[in-house]
């Protein structure tokens, strides 16, 4: 009797598994059609992914571990980006070794990673390629995080920061760079670069390097002395 009940429950699980598979197939088809309709070269939309994840986490309550939800949906996101054409991730050797777990947690283990000798080479690939991203240390006062003054970045954008789950009052460790200008969502924050110190109650100074200032704000600010460095989805605070 006991085993008979277990068999019934297992059959229910099998049925749910097939339902999940069929729903994923439908989702992939819709994603493919979206890719055809929008006719955009930019396949990676972190602000859209962040919005989806927040909505799912709100629905979840405390039923499932948020890390499981992140892992599951990241795999879905990447598989459907691959259906539309795929993306590549270029990393310098020092980044790939130190932060590989954080990167895989964000993109899933299926992401294609190409390593290069330097940040400059990685930025060059992003600038000249299509749907190529690179990841660099989040701008800070640390020695290895001063790359953001590189002239190559004048036509590139910061589009997201890692990790997605971030404890309150903690700073991100990594930032994603793309050639495609990011979209503005309601849960976004802005990074601005300036040659001058700016006094504005809506901005905070993230870091300073080589006579440049990097500011962060939750608002779009119109100031001729500020240049958009990035538009990033806000983190999910835990």
Question: What is the predicted role of each segment?
Answer:
Residues 2-238:
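Domain-level signature for soluble enzymes in the chorismate/prephenate branch of the shikimate pathway
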């Amino acid at each position: 009797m006991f085993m008979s009940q277990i068999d019934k429950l297992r059959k229910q699980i099998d049925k749910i598994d097939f339902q999940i598979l069929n729903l994923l197939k439908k989702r992939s088809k819709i994603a493919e059609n979206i890719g055809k309709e929008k006719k955009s070269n930019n396949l990676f939309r972190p602000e859209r992914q962040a919005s989806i994840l927040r909505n799912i986490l709100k629905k979840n309550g405390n039923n499932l571990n948020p890390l499981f939800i992140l892992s599951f949906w990241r795999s879905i996101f990447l598989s459907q980006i691959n259906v539309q054409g795929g993306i590549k991730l270029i990393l310098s050797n020092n980044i790939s070794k130190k932060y590989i777990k954080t990167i895989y947690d964000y993109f899933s283990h299926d992401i294609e990673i190409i390593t290069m000798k330097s940040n400059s080479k990685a930025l060059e690939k992003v600038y000249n390629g299509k749907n190529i991203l690179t990841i660099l240390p989040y701008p800070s006062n640390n020695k290895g995080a001063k790359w953001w003054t590189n002239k190559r970045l004048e036509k590139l954008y910061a589009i997201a920061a890692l990790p997605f789950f971030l404890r309150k009052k903690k700073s991100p460790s990594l930032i994603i760079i793309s050639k495609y200008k990011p979209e503005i969502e309601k849960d976004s924050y802005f990074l601005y670069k300036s040659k001058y110190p700016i006094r504005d109650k809506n901005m905070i100074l993230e870091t300073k390097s080589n006579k440049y200032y990097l500011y962060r704000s939750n608002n779009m600010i119109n100031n001729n002395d500020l240049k958009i460095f990035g538009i990033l989805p806000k983190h999910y605070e835990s």
